[in-house]
Structures are given as structure tokens and as C-alpha cells.
Curated annotation (Swiss-Prot):
GO CC annotation, single: clathrin coat of trans-Golgi network vesicle
Disruption phenotype: RNAi-mediated knockdown results in defective endocytosis by oocytes characterized by an accumulation of aggregated yolk protein in the pseudocoelomatic space.
Protein name as it appears in the record: Probable clathrin heavy chain 1
Keywords from the UniProt entry: Coated pit, Cytoplasmic vesicle, Membrane, Repeat
PANTHER family named among the record's database cross-references: CLATHRIN HEAVY CHAIN (PTHR10292:SF1), CLATHRIN HEAVY CHAIN RELATED (PTHR10292)
Organism: Caenorhabditis elegans
Region (WD40-like repeat 5): 194-255
Amino acid sequence: MALPIKFHEHLQLPNAGIRVPNITFSNVTMESDKNIVVREMIGDQQQVVIIDLADTANPTRRPISADSVIMHPTAKILALKSGKTLQIFNIELKAKVKAHQNVEDVVYWKWISEKTIALVSDTAVYHWSIEGDAAPVKMFDRHQSLAGTQIINYRADAENKWLVLIGISAKDSRVVGSMQLYSTERKVSQPIEGHAACFVRFKVDGNQNPSNLFCFSVKTDNGGKLHVIEVGTPAAGNTPFQKKNVDVPYTADTAGDFPVSMQVSAKQGIIYLVTKQGYVHLYDVESGTRIYSNRISTDTVFVTCEYTATGGIMGINRKGQVLSVSIDEANLVPFVTNQLQNPDLALKLAVRCDLPGAEELFVRKFNLLFSNGQFGESAKVAASAPQGILRTPATIQKFQQCPSTGPGPSPLLQYFGILLDQGKLNKYETLELCRPVLAQGRKELITKWLNDQKLECCEELGDLIKPHDVNTALSVYLRGNVPHKVVQSFAETGQFDKIVMYAKRVGFQPDYLFQLRQILRNSNPDHGAKFAQLLVSESENGEPLADLSQIIDCFMEVQAVQPCTSFLLEVLKGDKPEEGHLQTRLLEMNLLAAPAVADAILANKMFSHYDRAAIGQLCEKAGLLQRALEHFTDLYDIKRTVVHTHLLKPDWLVGYFGSLSVEDSVECLKAMLTQNIRQNLQVVVQIASKYHEQLGADKLIEMFENHKSYEGLFYFLGSIVNFSQDPEVHFKYIQAATRTGQIKEVERICRESQCYDAERVKNFLKEAKLNDQLPLIIVCDRHNMVHDLVLYLYRNQLQKYIEVFVQKVNAARLPIVVGALLDVDCSEDAIKQLIINTRGKFDIDELVEEVEKRNRLKLLNHWLESKIQEGATDAATHNAMAKIYIDSNNNPERFLKENPYYDSKVVGKYCEKRDPHYAFLSYERGQCDAELINVCNENSLFKNLARYLVKRRDFTLWEQVLNEENVHRRQLIDQVVQTALSETQDPEDISVTVKAFMAADLPNELIELLEKIVLDNSAFSEHRNLQNLLILTAMRADRTRVMEYIQKLDNYDAPDIANIAITSELYEEAFAIFKKFDVNSSAINVLIENVNNLDRAYEFAEKCNQSDVWASLAKAQLQQNLVKEAVDSFIKADDPGAYMEVVNKCSQTEHWEDLVRYLQMARKKSRESYIETELVFALAKTGRLTELEEFIAGPNHAQIGQIGDRCFDNGMFDSAKILFNNVSNFAKLSVTLVRLGEYQGAVDAARKANSTKTWKQVCFSCVENGEFRLAQMCGLHIVVHADELEELINFYQDRGHFEELIALLEAALGLERAHMGMFTELAILYSKYKPEKMREHLELFWSRVNIPKVLRAAEQAHLWSELVFLYDKYEEYDNAALTMMQHPTESWREQHFKEVIAKVANVELYYKAMQFYLDYKPLLLNDLLTVLSPRLDHSRTVLFFNKLKQIPLVKPYLRQVQNLNNKAINEALNQLLIDEEDHAGLRSSIEAQDNFDNITLAQQLEKHPLVEFRRISAYLFKGNNRWKQSIELCKKDKLYKDAMEYAAESRNGELAEELLSFFLDEKLYDCFAASLYHCYDLLHPDVIMELAWKHKIMDYAMPYMIQVMRDYQTRLEKLERSEHERKEEKAEQQQNNGMTMEPQLMLTYGAPAPQMTYPGTTGGYGGQPAYGQPGQPGYNAPGFM
């Protein structure tokens, strides 16, 4: 019986590059059957692998740092979790969708819909929407029953009203499932024991709405159960679902199995339940009936999802196989019917899933109900039958023929009503329903049914509706895909825009040009443009649906220029070269009909591939000069047109010149000036201004000058001068402006331009002799020609312009002007007056310099005094006055001290050579440090310099003067120490000076300075910092004086100074400081750490007798390995603080007794665990086992287990035994007892420990010491762990204990936890050491061994029989067959071989098997071929035996398979029969099978010595229409009867007449008469009469002639009778003409079949209508088009 399920392997994850260790529940997720996501570690980098199940060959890898990844069920969206950080990322958009930082760790998460992720923490469950920015929403708290469980699943119903959380945990050697069912409406939870669950919306028979069902399965000690219950309140009108509670079978071998996942197909109503050990169970939701169970995987299936393609389930097992299970639609119903003997369930499944297999049941039920008059029920059965098996014309005919049973609707109407309620009608049902409805005029019903998708649309239905409603018919044609009728209907309804779109969509090609012409003639031309546009825009492969030129012709036929223009503008917007002729045509039609439109088109520059020359000429004729110029390329044409500037836009014309060459542009400009300079000058200037860079300014200037147009030159140059750097342009502009009287512009350009030649312009302006000299003044002022300017103006009597220059133009030039006037001997009074009158700003220093150079400084005295009196505070004025006072010795010292405005540097510099004292005063007043130091050094003013430095308090200045390169440093230091510091009382002065000496690294001078301050009883003697500095400086400069200062001084920082002394290696001085200030702990540290004298330290400690001193000494002694002395010192210090160091040192030096003393003291002070732990170990080390036992028996904080380990590691097994026993560490105790040789005790301890590692250690030790009985006891606890089995076996085998190992495994097979590895390894051991036992072992336990592994072992051991057995069980039939053929003496068994060979996949093995049988078992060869015949290539098989010349051996096989009508078989068998001269068999063969070369065989048999074979040859010729050849052969062998029969069969009169002639020639008159009978209808009576008369055998021909006369008579009588009947019918028809033959149709009457015709109608689409019926348009009827 075929299985009711389909099992398919989609993928193996290892083949996609996934390593098997990564295939785990935590690393692999599958949220849907679209994608699989795997987290994988590659080296040090973690990656996520995304496998698209639609494209498994191309997995996507991305680096990640997340610890969990789940993929969106349908979209390319990843959810990633790293710790408490959650993130959603869109892979396609490469963008982060959402992120959240969770408060709790998420232990499980899952997509429960396309928009929601469920998050499960240790305490609660949350829902997180991927839409918006909202954080996860808490749904409910976890129930306490799920505490400590591993969450494996979470499910929600369709409306998220019911939620269930599922977890598992280990309890009492089994896996317990815990579930929490939660209602979001009632906010309550219910704990349930269960392992797998899901929700489903399922519609129960009789209910209007689906029920919300909750399905879950549980495995307990009492067995497995599946529960199906309804949750929530049933929908209104629904009958509550009856709870189902059914058993889930678990065998003894699967006692540890339990459900892991569940999926329910809502459409099929089937539950798919998968268990841990790979079993799948199928249940019907409605009845709870178990449909099928089987094992689909030997490995655990740890993740599943719904397989949407078939409604089944998809899962992944530990090996990485991606498997799916679905129902087999072809076999499910037969399986339920025959195997389960449940026809009711089979019917339900067939209806629910629309499955085949129950046709007979439905037909029987329908016929029974129909025969009983239950038409309503039978209609329901017919409507619900799967795959429409009862929805046939025969069923409709049945309902049409049955009478109406009462006032209600007729059976046919009931049937159609049920069909409409359940779904869509088929084509025949639609037509039968719509005919009477349309006849009654109720087309709204049809419209309603069409909108509800209840009718199957077809051409016939559209034709039926079209006379009543064209739009509805169009809808039907569209839905029924009848393109030619759709296009026709669109045209009739004016929906032209839809024609192209529809035709393209369905691939139909209508006559578009015809449709376009119809639109242009009968409709708005604009619609034609739109339609034409569609013909182009909806093109395929870049080609329009109609030729563009022909489309344009269509427009031109009706003179539709504007619509055609609109169309072409849209079509040609791509501006392609191949469209040039169309562009030309577009422009031509508009230039002739609408020049403005053409102008707009050209203005937008839409086209570039038209005939420019032709269009240019047309533009000129149309008055579009601008467009004509754009198209002209000949200079003559351009010059002819361009001079008409009044007809051209200036802006455009300027832009146009940009497209001309330089030479052409200049020529055109000249032509424009020559034609009409007044009219064209302005535009010429504009053009020249814009293109001067390209045309060349020199050429343009020359052009204007040649036409003597200085005005044009002025305007041209004025437009470019501000941007030009050409000196010539600027000069020409100044010239043009001067000549046109534009003096203000001359002033501006002279003032602003940077490019003209100043000398050339100055000379031009002098020669021009302008009335206004301001341009000349500006040029000379800007270019420093003021001296020349003053000379020119003074000599030309233009003094007023000198005053204008300094007073209005540039007052800053006054000093130069004064100097120039002095040079020309101008009077002092005039100069003074000029200075006084000049109110602008000028440089007084420069003025003073100019006057001073000419020894006329006193000239400024009164002017300067007046300025000071006016309140002038500028430095220049006061500097000049200071110089005058110093030179005149007019009380300068007072001026220098009191005047705040002069520049100290300037005046000081002026005084240096005249009086250094005045220079010092000036520099001091301005803090000019560098100048002051320099003047003091040069003039030995060190005392003044020292006072200045102390008061200045500037470190930079001190650094400069105290530099060792300063030759005057010593003199300055002496003045600082002797004079400057003695005079000051400001501590800040002292501080800065001392710091400066320190920074200058002058320790000796600093000591000298500090002694002066500190030791000479000054005001700063008790200053702490100064005392510190003195001692520190002495440490650095003179160490011999340090002890003296320590003793003399008391107000210094002793700890800091002592520490510095230590770093300076002044240990005695540091010790003296600590001792002086009673810091004894630090003092002894100096003796210990620096002086390194423990004896002095010990003496010092005895003197002090302080705990901290003793502790410091003890630590030092400990570091020097003086352990006993250190312990004594620690005890004197009574300090347990250093117990860590003491323990480490005593342990290193083996001073365990001293350690005991110290730790006993320390224990009194502190009950630290470490102290007591080390005391225990020290007692163990000293062998004080009694004290040890007493200590650990009492209260303590020691780490007994840790000490036990240390004792064990150090070989102190007696102590370890005591300690391990104390803490009940039986695992370690057992190993310790093994070391002590107490094996029985070790086994007992191991039993208490119950640890695999312990069992291994004890077992191995027992094996090593020959205690095999105890070793076996231990081994039984090891072998049940598959991971440990290999190590155990290797240990035994390496030591040669094979018998004991086999005994151990044999004893272990009966254990409850026996697993596959044990059976496998025992089989391998049997193959190596006891091959005689292997067969029995495999026959008993083949299903529990790892067959591939045992296969290798059996092959290596040459156990061929066992190898075949395993290959058979493993379904490797190819290898099994090969092995039997290679080793037949040991492994071949006839029946077994035939069973195996029929299952092999490799067809080549069939032929190897044939050869094998030929070699070893030739008599059984036909039996083998019988078995293989369903799968053999019979042609190849025949060829195989032909090559070996063994065809006779396989004759039975050939007989058996001849019914296949294979050519090779037929020819081989026929040849064999020929060889055997079996003509009867050959005749039978060729009559039964015709697939062979008939002609070749006929030709072969034609020459055969036996007549029967030649007769067969004639038969074959006849069968191949070689009648003549066949008859000739019969005549040759005198087979006259055959010849007559063949001549009759040939239907050839000539052959028949030839045969008659042959008989007459041979005087075979009887055969002649017989031939007349056989060939009666082929012969001509006149020919026969002639032959008979010639040969005088009329008697032989007379029977033939009598029969001919009778036939002629009969035909005449029939013809007369037929004519008489035709006349009667015609008369009757004329008499009945005009009568109505049929009543109005009603729905209950039904409709005639499409092929039927009514009386008075002719049938067909083009026939005439019946009387009283409307005409139907047909293909041949008027009005169709």
C-alpha cells in the first residue's frame, strides 16, 4: 500500500558550508520555510549564514557580534540580540529599523507575526512591534511552574488573544514539559503539563465561523496524549467544539521520547506532531483520529515550521538535514479508506482537502440520494465532491430531467444555488444557468454573479450577453481572455486608450492603423493623438506598434496638424539620429501651417537631426530671421540677414555671435557698422563687450578707430576696462574718455585702475593740458611721482593744485611735498602756512625726518608746541619735542620722567650716545628690558640693573641675565646679594629671585643667597620653604653641610626631606631625621631597606619595642629567608597580617613546624578561611593526623576539599583519604582509595559519587591491576554514555583485554540506557575477534547499530555475508548486489539476490548481474530477467545477449516481454523463430506485435525455402501496402485464395482486373468466378462482360451480372422514394410557416445543449433566428463589425 505522506530532503546544511558542531538549537533558527539562519564561528570571527531555501546554492555570510539571530518570516529583515541589546536590521535597505536596550536578559525570542517579536525573559514575556518607536510591551509574568525550564517555543493564535509559553526540564530521569496558557482578554494564566502546542482556526462542519482551537501534546509516565480543545467563547451561531483527547503511541524502544514540536494545517485540518527521536504523527483535528505514524529521522529534530507549499511541516535535525513531511494527495484518501477502514474520515478529508481517491464513494452516495428523491442532499454531494468529479453535463441533465417536487425551487435551481453558495461555476454550468436568466431579462443577476466571481467567463458567455449589455460582455471577454472580442468591444464603446494596453498585456496584435483612422474620422482628433501616443509608448523592444510615417499619413489625411504636432513632440523627445526625417517633417508642416509653433519648437532646441539647410530657408521665407540665422552656415547668408538688427532680439543676437568663428564675427560686425552705424552701434558694442576675449580687444579697438567711432570705443572699453588687465585697454579708455569729455571717468579710472602704464598716462595728461589737473594729481599720487608733480605744478604756476593735493587729495603726502618745496627754495612762511592749513592725517615722524634731513627741525618747534597745547597725545609729536628738549638741554630729565606719551624706545635710542642715564630713565619707564640691559652692561650700571631685576620679578629676564654666557653675571649677582635683596622687604621679591637662581642652576650662589637670608637672623629666618630649600640645595651642591643644617634647623618638612635624602642616598641623614622626629617605623625601614643592616635593625627594634617596628623587621627577615627569626619577630609583633607571605615562604623552604606555630598564633587573631586551610595542610605535612582529625572534626572555616586535592597531588593519600571522607567527596575518595590499593572501597565510593569521570578512573585502574570483575562493574556505568564509549574500548584494546571488553559490552546490552554506540562497537569487536557471533548479533540488533560504521568493519574483516546483510538493511542495494557478485560462494543467495537486484538504483548493475548469471547460474537467467523486466532497457538487453550469442537462452524472457512491442525484442524473437523454422509462432508474433522492420523481414522471408515463410512474406508486403508485390508472390506460390483476398483489401480496381486476367490466362475459371465475388465492388460490369464474352465463359460471370442488375434496381427505387418525401416535407413547412413554436423560457426548464437546434432555426452563429426571437449577431450576420 502506498504511503499517505511525502517525505523530502531539501538540503543538508553541511553541504552549504555549515559545520556540524554549529547545528544546535541555540545557533540555528528557522522562523519560516523561506530562510534558515545559522550563527557560526570561523576562526576568531563570528558570522551569520543566511540560507534562502529558494536558492540554497548561494548562502549569504555576514560578520556579526550577536549571540542570537532570527529572520523575519517573509522579508529580508534580521533581528539580532547581543546581551541585553536588541536590534532589527533591514538587509535589503542596509538600514537599522529599530533598536532597544532591554533591562532583563532575553532567554528566548521568536517572530509570532510579520510585525511582532515575542521576547521571553526569566520573569516575563514581552511583545515588541517593529513599527514605530515603542519599546517592548509586557504581556504577562512567567508562571512559577516554568521556573528553571528551558524555553523551547512560544505560540500565539491568529488574533493574539491567546498565548502559550512552552518549556522543558529534567525531572526523575525524564523530560517534563511545562506550558503556560494566557488569555490577553481575561489577563489570567493557566499552567499545563505539555511539551508541544499550537493554535489553529478550524471550521467544523455545520458551523458558519471557524473555531479557535488549542492543540497540545504531553508525554508522561503513563504514555502520550494529544488534546484538542476550543479556547475562548464560541462565535455566535457556532456549535462548541467537542474536546478531543487521544493517545500518542510510544513503544518500549521510544520510552524516552517526547514531543518537541507541532504544526497544524488549517486548510487540511491535519496535526503534524514531531517527537525528539524523529517520529512524526498525523492526526485529524476534527475527530482526533490518528492517520499515520512513522520515523522520519534517526537524529533529533530540534526546530520546525510550517511548510506553506503543501501545508505540511518542515524541520532540521542534528545532522543538518532540512526535511519536510506533507500529505500525499494521491494516496491519502485510499490509505484512510483501505488501511484505516475509515470511509467517513476519507470522505471528510477528500472534501476538505479536495483530494482524489474517493470518487467511487461520492458517485455511489450521489446516486443513492438522487434515486431516493433527496435532490437537495444529492445536490450538496455533487457540489462538494472533490475535484469536481460530479460537476458534469450529465449531472445537470439529470437535474433538468427530474420533475419539480412542490412549490419550492426546482431541483436544478437548488443545485445551481448550492454551487453558487460554495464557489464558482464551471463553463458548462455557467452557460446553462445564464441562458434562461437572460431570456427572462434579469441581466442584473449575471452582473452580481460576475462581481462575486461566481461564473467562469468564456467567449460563448460573452456572445450570449452582448446583445443585452455590451459593457458586461466586455467584462466577460476580459475575464475569459478573448482578445479579438475585447478589442472589438473597446472600439464599439469608444475606449480606444485601453486597446493598446490590453493587446500588449495579452500578446494580441490588432490592426492599429485602421483603429487610428476610425478615431480621426469619427471622433476628436485629440483622441487620435492620444491613441497614436499609446501606439508608440507601449512599444516592445523599442519598436512602435505601427510605423510612424504611416501614423503621420493618417493625421495628414484629415489635415490634423495640431494633434499630429502634439503626438510627434512627445514621440520625438528622445532626439535620436534615426528620427531625423520625422523631425524635418514635423518642422516643415508647422513652418507652412503654423510658423509660431515651429518657432517655439526651434526655440526649445528639442531636435538636432533634421535637415538644417532646408529648414533654414523655410524659416527665412516665413520671416523667422532669428531661426534662419541659427540654421545658416554660409557667411554670405549670415551677413545678408544679420544686418537687419531691428528685426532681431538684441539679447539673442549677442548670444548668436558666440556660435560664429572669430573671423566671421569680425566681418559681421564690420558689415553692421558699415550698413548703419547709428542703428547698429549699440548692439555692436554689446557684442564686442561680450566676446572681446575671443575676438581680441586690439582688433575691436582698431575696428572702432577705423570707423572713427570714439563714442563706440568709449562704451566698448568702458564695459571691459573694469575686468581687463591689459594696459593698452586702460590707456585707450583714458584717451577715449578724454576725447569724449568724460573727465570724471578719467579721474575714476586713474584712481581705481591697477593696469595702466603710469609714466605714459602722466605724459599724456601733461600734453593734454586739461583745465582740471586732478587726474594728473591722482596718477602721480598713486605711483609715487609726488616730487615730480610738485615740481611740475610749482614751475607752471599751479600752486593752488599743490594745496588741493595735500588738503583734499592725500594729506599723507605732506612730508614729501614739504621736502620738495624746501628743495625748490620755497619760503618758510609759505611752508609753515601749508602745514598749518593741512588738517588731514599725515605721518609726523616722516615730516620730522624730512625736515631733520635738511637741518630745519626748529622749523616745527612752534607748530609742535601748539599741537601739545591743543591736547595732542600721539607719540610722534612728543618724540619730536623730546628730541628738541634734549638737543637744547631744556630740563630733559623732568620731561623723560613725567611725560607719559613719548615712545621710550625711540627716545632711549636717541639718548644712548648723548647721555646713558637719560637712556636708562627712558627704557625703565617703558620696560624696554633688552635695551635697558644692553645700556647697563655697556655703561656698568649693575646696581641699577640689580634693583630693576628684583622689582621687575620677570623669570624670562632673570634667565637672560643669569645665563652663563653673560660676561657680566658675577658683577650682577654680587649687586643682587649685597644691595638689592638687602633693600627689599617684599617676600614676593625674595621668592622670585630664589626661583630664578634655582632655574639658572646656580646651587653655590643660591646657598650663598639663602644663608644670607636664613642664617643672618633676617625677617625670613624661620621661613619653612627657605629652610627646606637650603637643605635640599646643600644635598645637591655640598653634602658635607647637610647634617649640619639638619641639626641647626628645626622648621623644615622632616618626612619629605628624609625621603629626598633617601633618594639621594643620604641614608644616615635620613635615619637621623626620622630618629630626631620619632618616626621609628620609617627609621627601621631605612636600616633595613637602605643600610641593609639587620643587626642594627634588630637592636633598634629591641630599644623601641613597638609592634610595627617588629613587624617591619619580621618582613625583612622573611625576605632574607630567615624564616625562624621572622616567625619569632611576627609572634613578638603579634601581627597575623602577613599570613599569605609567611605561608608561601614556609611552603617554599619546608618550615612546616614554624608555619604551624605562626598559624596557631594567627588563628587566635583571625578566623580567616585561608589561615585555617593552610593550618590543616601544615598539620598534614607534619604528619599530625590525630590533630588533623580533631581539627576538622571541630568547627572550622578550612577548605577541606581543596586541601584534600593538594594532599592527593603531593602523594599524601592517607591525609587525602581523611579529608575527602570528611567532605563526602566520593569521586576523589574513590581515586584516592585506588592509589592506596583499596579497589573494593574505591568501587563503593564511585557508586556513591555516580560520576562518569570517577567510574572511568576506577575502571581503568582496576583494568591496569587485573581487577576485571570490578572493572566490569564500573564499565557498565560508563558504556551508557556514548561520548565515553570509544575511550573505554580503546583502553581495553590497547592492553589486549578483548574477551573482557566483549563480556562487558554483552552485559551492557540489557541495560535500560543501552544506545546505538554499544551495539555498534560490539558488532565491530565481533568482526575482529569473534566473527562467528556477528551474524546473530546483526540479525537481532541491526536496527540499533550504526550501519555505515559496521559496514566498514565487516568489509575489513572480509565478512561478506554479513556485509550483504547490512547493505540490504541500509538500503544500499547497489553495494549489496555488487558484493554478492564479487563473493558469490559466501554471500550469494538466489532469492535474496533477486530481491536486492530489483531495488538497485544503478542500471549498469543489471547487466553485470546478467553476466554473473551467465558465468555461474545460466539456468536461472530467465528468472533474473523476469524480476528485472519492469526496469530493463530491453533494446540494450537484447543487444547484450546478441553480442554474447545467447539469444536462444533467453527465449522465455523474450516471450514474456514481447507484449511491450519493442522493436529489438520483436526482431530478436522473430529471427529466433525463423532459425527454429517455427512459421506458426512467427505468424502469431508478427500479427500480435508490429514494431519491427516489416520490409526487411518480408524481403528476408521472400527467399525462404519453406512456402509458409514465403506466405508470411506476402502477408507482410500486403500489410505495408505493397499489394502488387504481395499478389505476385501469392501467384508465384499458387496461393490463389490469398491473392484474391489481398486484391479485395487493396481497394484497387486495376490490381483486381490484372488478377482476373491472370486467372483467365491460366484458364483458372473457378478462381475467376471466386474473384468476382471477392472483388465485387472494385470491378466494372462492362469490363467483366467483355472478358467473359472473349473467353466464352459467360456462365462463370452470370452470378456477378445478376447481382449488379439487382443493385441498380434498388438504387433507383430509393431515389424515387426520397424525392417524394422531400416534396411532402416542403409542402408541410409552407403550411406551418408563421407559427410560434416555443414558450418563454423559465429557469426550471433548463436550456438546450449548445449543438441542438429548434424547429425553424438553422443553428450556428450566423443562422436566421426563430420566429419571435431576437437576432443574434454571428460571424456571417450583418452588423457584426
